[in-house]
From Swiss-Prot:
It comes from Homo sapiens (Human). One of its GO terms (molecular function) is actin binding. It is found in: Cytoplasm, Myofibril, Sarcomere; Cytoplasm, Cytoskeleton. Keywords: Actin-binding, Activator, Cytoplasm, Cytoskeleton, Phosphoprotein, Protein transport, Transcription, Transcription regulation, Translocation, Transport. Residues 199-299 are annotated as: Actin-binding 1. This is Actin-binding Rho-activating protein. The actin-binding domain 1 (ABD1) is intrinsically disordered, and binds to F-actin with higher affinity than ABD2. Residues 240-285, 352-381 are annotated as: Interaction with actin. Residues 97-110, 179-188 have a biased composition (Basic and acidic residues). Gene3D superfamilies: Costar domain (1.10.10.1540). GO terms for biological process: actin cytoskeleton organization; positive regulation of Rho protein signal transduction; positive regulation of transcription by RNA polymerase II; protein import into nucleus; transcription by RNA polymerase II. Coiled coil: none annotated.
Length: 381
């Protein structure tokens, strides 16, 4: 047999052996994992409730004397005696682990539940409504606990400040009422016999109530509730989708009808209305587009652009000519045209606009290249 055929024959055998070894390794790993999982589940099921792993450990330096187990500990350690052990472990190991299991101590686990943000807000609103609604004597125990819990919670600083102010005002008011309460009534027999006892008792009570009302500032209704009610009303009125769409459509329809009456190219053109509403020379807005329209926006942008070009031309005139003794700056139209035509071809138009705004001055109504090159342009700025 050729050596090539021998190598090709040994290749499949090696691959088959490799596959078998891999399969046996995987099976053994799976068995070991399953055995460990079973032992762990049995161990967890036999552990007493409330036990923390590693929670309490005895110090190895100071061993305590072993006390005989009580009946309760025997009952707990009884189901732990037959745990499953992997193959190959002797009885000696089980006898050594038995006393370790019997020394397990119990520990109660307490869990504290912290209220969320919306629950704190509900508690604050509940307390505020109760203070606004009830004018009687507060219970000494429960309200203080609720107040302390809310004030010491990690809620909103604004909410804590409002609640703290409300509580401080209420406590001050109740203290004043408790201090002034003995002065409202008189236990004297002379006052009762004289006939002033009943009225004297009723009047100070009314005065005390008035004083308490003045000193205790109870928001009725609270500003927060009123603010939220106003916001809700505004939201319903302003942000109603149907009402919004209807109002906008009606407004657009009215504006369109009015514009068609003033449009001379429309069939609904009203000549009398147009003549009565037209602007005359000297009126504000005459010769300008209507404010708020796109034409007015385009006109504003054009004015800004032309003003920048006029300022550029004045700057170029300043750089070209020399200052005279009288302070005037002059340049001929031919020199300015040769220089500025490289920047913009609207030389004459910008000069005419600048003369209208009082920035430059020159003779003639119009300037022509070649014919008016000798015309002097004076900068007035």
């Amino acid at each position: 047999m050729a050596p090539g055929e021998k190598e090709s024959g040994e290749g499949p055998a090696k691959s088959a052996l490799r596959k078998i070894r891999t399969a046996t390794l995987v099976i053994s790993l799976a068995r070991g994992w399953q055995q460990w999982a079973n032992e762990n589940s049995i161990r967890q099921a036999q552990e007493p409730t409330g036990w923390l792993p590693g929670g309490t450990q005895d110090s190895p330096q100071a061993p305590k004397p072993i006390t005989p187990p009580t009946s309760h500990q025997k009952a707990q350690s009884a189901p732990k005696s037959p745990p499953r052990l992997p193959e190959g472990h002797g009885d000696g190991q089980s006898s050594e682990k038995a006393p370790e299991v019997s020394h397990i101590k119990k520990k109660e686990v307490s869990k504290t539940v912290v209220s969320k943000t919306y629950e704190r807000g509900g508690d604050v609103s509940h307390l505020s409504h109760r203070y606004e609604r009830d004018a009687g004597v507060l219970e000494p125990g429960q309200p203080e606990n609720d107040i302390d819990r809310i004030l010491h919670s990690h809620g909103s600083p604004t909410r804590r400040r409002k609640c703290a102010n409300l509580v401080s005002e209420l406590t001050k008011g109740w203290r004043v009422m408790e201090q002034e309460e003995p002065t409202w009534r008189s236990d004297s027999v002379d006052t009762e016999d004289s006939g002033y006892g009943g009225e004297a008792e009723e009047r100070p009570e009314q005065d005390g109530v008035q004083v308490a009302v003045v000193r205790i500032k109870r928001p009725l209704p609270s500003q927060v509730n009123r603010f939220t009610e106003k916001l809700n009303c505004k939201a319903q009125q302003k942000y109603s989708p149907v009402g919004n769409l209807k109002g906008r459509w009606q407004q657009w329809a009215d504006e369109h009808i009015q514009s068609q009456k003033l449009n001379p190219f429309s069939e609904e053109f009203d000549y009398e209305l147009a003549m009565s509403t037209r602007l005359h020379k000297g009126d504000e807005g005459y010769g300008r587009p209507k404010e708020g329209t796109k034409t007015a926006e385009r006109a504003k942008r054009a004015e800004e652009h032309i003003y920048r070009e006029m300022m550029d031309m004045c700057f170029i005139i300043c750089t070209m000519a020399r200052h005279r003794r009288d302070g005037k700056i002059q340049v001929t139209f031919g020199d300015l045209f040769d220089r500025y035509v490289r920047i913009s071809d609207k030389v004459v138009g910008i000069l005419m606009r600048a003369r209208k705004h009082g920035l430059v001055d020159f003779e003639g109504e119009m300037l022509w290249q070649g014919r008016d090159d000798h015309v002097v342009i004076t900068l007035l700025k």
